[in-house]
Amino acid sequence: MGGGGDVVGALGASNLLDDLGTEWTLGGVAWERSPIDPRPGPRSLEEIRGGRPCGSAAVMTEGGTTSLDGVEFSESKMASHLGRPVLLLDITRGPAALATGIAEAAEELGCDAVVLLDVGGDVLAHGDEPGLASPLCDALVLAAGLFLARGAARTAASPEGWRGDLLGAVYGPGCDGELTPDEVLERITELQAADALLGTWGLTPEACDLVESAARAVPTEASLMAVRCARGERGSVPIRSGRRTVELTPLGALTFFFDPAAAAGSAIPLTTAVSPAASLEEAHDALMGMGVRTELDLERARAAGSHE
């Protein structure tokens, strides 16, 4: 669901699909962390250079795809690493437009299911967790997933609405240093109470190798924390230059799969809040109205500070 290094976590989870004999295509959001791209916020399609259009909200990159400022996207680096195309999503026009774009891309690629994966578990946040730092992107993308799940993403090929399967996933609970492992577990019990939890999968040695190899091409800390958990490490590890701390536990080696539509009634309040938004800014304002500060606020504050 995120940008930056989240695509590495998605690659780790793809190992499950390999074991099931299922073909897959990776994707991610055109939004790099501020140390990589100092310009705040995600990039729109008009701000992406390279790649080929794939639906109305994405481009397919095979490498060398950058912002207009020359910043190469993590998804582009992943495509070069894998030697296969990766999808790059524009989330700036809000959940409904993104859902249509994802449905169009899924049809073009021949995908009959979409898995929206969050690294860390902040997509399940309530908004009052002390460590929560990046709720906006995840909430907006999962809100697009709700449109998909409800058949509300209409395309030229599917005028009655796209009818593929839609799953949510949390990879490496607590591994981004935002929600603690205990907080993520509390949110998982909310999924269970809503009959929304579908299953759990643990990182295999092969999946760990995939993540470690990809992380040499695509900078990431959170996705690698899950590997360290799977390798049996324990303890507290600082990330983000010491601004966050990850507690390495067995929980971090797991990926939880859930039904977003079933969760929408009670377990994903931030996603529900941004669902009506017609743009990224409206989604941001919806969370701000709940008293939830987002990654966009943090990036804008950093950018303003660098220009003072």
Predicted regions: what they are:
Residues 1-8, 130-131:
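Short, glycine-rich nucleotide/cofactor-binding loops
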Residues 7-22, 26, 138-147:
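Histidine-anchored nucleotide/phosphate-binding helix
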Residues 18, 24-88:
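Glycine-rich nucleotide/cofactor/substrate-binding loop typically near the N-terminus or early
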Residues 45-69, 188-217:
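A glycine-rich helix N-cap at a beta->alpha junction
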Residues 59-99, 105, 153-162, 166-173:
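Cap/lid and interdomain-hinge subdomains that line or gate substrate/regulatory clefts
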Residues 81-148:
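Internal, conserved structured core segments that host functional sites
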Residues 122-167, 172-189:
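Conserved phosphate- and dinucleotide-binding cores of soluble alpha/beta proteins
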Residues 218-308:
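C-terminal accessory domains and tails appended to enzymatic cores
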